């Protein structure tokens, strides 16, 4: 019974660390995207960040 308990604890720990790494990657990408939108120096000149007009600017169609 103790071995089953240890296996459950191990599986939970491994799952937790894996999930943390996945979420850190997503958070980093989201933060980088937010910085691009807020900082005028990082934006493409003449590019509109409004989703309604992006298709008409920046060569995105």
UniProtKB/Swiss-Prot annotation:
Negative results: has no effect on chimeric alpha-7 (CHRNA7), alpha-3-beta-2 (CHRNA3-CHRNB2) and alpha-4-beta-2 (CHRNA4-CHRNB2). GO terms for cellular component: extracellular region; host cell postsynaptic membrane. Residues 1-16 form the signal peptide. The modification Hydroxyproline is found at residue 45. It comes from Conus ermineus (Agate cone). InterPro entries: Conotoxin_a-typ. This is Alpha-conotoxin EIIA. Keywords: Acetylcholine receptor inhibiting toxin, Amidation, Cleavage on pair of basic residues, Disulfide bond, Hydroxylation, Neurotoxin, Postsynaptic neurotoxin, Pyrrolidone carboxylic acid, Secreted, Signal, Toxin. Alpha-conotoxins bind to the nicotinic acetylcholine receptors (nAChR) and inhibit them. This peptide potently blocks muscular nicotinic acetylcholine receptor (CHRNA1-CHRNB1-CHRNG-CHRND), and has no effect on neuronal receptors. It is able to totally displace [125I]-Bgtx from the Torpedo receptor with a complete inhibition in the high micromolar range. It produces a biphasic inhibition curve which fits nicely with a two-site model (Ki of 0.46 and 105 nM). Residues 17-40 form a propeptide. Belongs to the conotoxin A superfamily. The keyword Signal applies. The lineage of its organism: Eukaryota, Metazoa, Spiralia, Lophotrochozoa, Mollusca. Disulfide bonds join 47-53, 48-58.
């Amino acid at each position: 019974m103790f071995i089953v308990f240890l296996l459950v604890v191990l599986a939970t720990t491994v799952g937790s660390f894996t999930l943390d790494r996945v979420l850190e990657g997503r958070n980093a990408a989201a933060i980088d995207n937010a910085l691009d939108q807020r900082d005028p120096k990082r934006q493409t000149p003449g590019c509109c960040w409004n989703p309604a007009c992006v298709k008409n600017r920046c060569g995105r169609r």
